[in-house]
């Protein structure tokens, strides 16, 4: 899908979500502008054909681009495939895998996609599901919120922006702080000023850094732009929630920490030569006789030292959370998105540049 189509879909979706309540009637089968029942029934490929559920619960989109429209409703079907119910105390939650593998937490949830799931579920007409899932990660024994990277506090605040619930938001604050401190105690390197994470636990099992180490699946703990962006976003979210609750000292502490984290990330993970954000190795690494020094960015050392590639899509994650002002010098990174020597591909961007020496179809 071309980037223009993607941008168009974002604009249309934004309009749809902002205006759904203006145009919708209470009837399950009709609306003043859109025949919701007819639209959803036209998506005949959906496995879930509980048409009434879609009509009652999701915001509707009608646009002339069939690919965008089909993708939009397919994403809502995925929500239904992974929606489950724990018990009366936990309420609704989402799985990552339908078969609930052994590494999942209570009732099958896994923290890796939790930020995405909360971002999507917040647009349901009722806030019940997204608010239940927010509580799940904070209150449920066995939820395992720190098994994988995620932007939990930021996502919880995003849910509240659509379905305001000051009482619930305030009740989750201490748990969100405890979760953040859990990450900080285990993954923050005060000597560097950044959080470290492995690609595997950052939701990227195959990555350039780990494939240059002895452990290609779980190796190469690094100061990754993705994980540090998540932790910056969570710190800012906790500060905002604390502000809403009148907890001024917590607000101040987390804002100050976020500011320092951002400054350090820009100074250490941005490569002005390659104009992109890269992971920085935490430890000395070696593979096949090639040594990589701790504190170097991907391809600054080792077998491919000096190569002009090494970019991965995680270098764009900081923009998800608006870490920079518009027209910042870091926007040069976006030149690679539509570059055929970079990430451009016919069916969506590749995770590694296509002409990278370590490009791999996996």
Write out the residue ranges for each language-model feature:
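Positively charged n-region of N-terminal signal peptides that target proteins for export
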Residues: 1-4
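Bacterial N-terminal signal peptides
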Residues: 8-18
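Boundary at the C-terminal end of the N-terminal hydrophobic targeting segment
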Residues: 19-24
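Catalytic cores of carbohydrate-active enzymes
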Residues: 29, 33-37, 42-46, 50-55, ...
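Substrate-binding groove/exosite segments of carbohydrate-active enzymes
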Residues: 40-173, 177, 278-279, 299-323, ...
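A generic secondary-structure signal for well-formed alpha-helical elements
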Residues: 79, 83-86, 125-128, 156-163, ...
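Active-site lining segments of carbohydrate-active enzymes
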Residues: 89-112, 116, 173-221, 243-244, ...
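Acidic/His metal-coordination segments adjacent to aromatic residues that form catalytic metal sites
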Residues: 96-99, 130, 134-142, 201-223, ...
């Amino acid at each position: 899908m071309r980037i223009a189509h993607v941008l168009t879909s974002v604009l249309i979706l934004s309009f749809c979500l902002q205006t759904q309540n203006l145009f919708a009637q209470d009837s399950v089968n009709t609306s003043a502008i859109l025949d919701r029942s007819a639209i959803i029934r036209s998506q005949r490929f959906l496995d879930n054909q509980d048409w009434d559920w879609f009509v009652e619960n999701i915001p509707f989109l009608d646009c002339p681009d069939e690919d965008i429209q089909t993708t939009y409703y397919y994403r809502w079907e995925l929500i239904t495939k992974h929606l489950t119910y724990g018990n009366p105390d936990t309420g609704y939650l989402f799985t990552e895998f339908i078969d609930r593998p052994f590494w999942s937490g209570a009732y099958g949830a896994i923290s890796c996609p939790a930020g995405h799931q909360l971002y999507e579920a917040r647009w349901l007409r009722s806030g019940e599901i997204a608010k239940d899932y927010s509580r799940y990660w904070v209150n449920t024994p066995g939820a395992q919120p720190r098994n994988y990277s995620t932007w939990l506090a930021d996502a919880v605040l995003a849910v509240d922006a659509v379905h305001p619930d000051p009482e619930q938001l305030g009740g989750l604050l201490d748990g969100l702080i405890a979760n953040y401190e859990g990450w900080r105690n285990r993954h923050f390197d005060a000597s560097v000023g950044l959080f470290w994470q492995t690609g595997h636990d950052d939701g990227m099992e195959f990555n350039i850094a780990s494939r240059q180490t002895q452990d290609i699946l779980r190796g190469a703990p690094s100061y990754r732009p993705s994980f540090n962006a998540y932790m910056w976003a969570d710190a800012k979210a906790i500060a905002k929630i604390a502000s809403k609750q009148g907890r001024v000292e917590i607000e101040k502490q987390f804002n100050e920490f976020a500011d320092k984290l951002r400054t350090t990330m820009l100074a250490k993970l941005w490569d002005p030569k390659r104009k992109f954000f890269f992971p920085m190795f935490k430890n000395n690494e070696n593979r096949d006789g090639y040594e990589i020094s701790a504190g170097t960015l991907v391809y600054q050392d080792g077998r491919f030292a000096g190569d002009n590639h090494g970019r991965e899509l995680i270098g764009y994650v900081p923009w998800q959370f608006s870490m920079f002002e518009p027209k910042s010098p870091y926007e040069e990174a976006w030149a690679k998105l539509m570059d055929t020597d970079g990430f451009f591909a016919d069916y969506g961007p590749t995770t590694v540049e296509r002409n990278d020496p370590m490009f791999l179809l996996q």
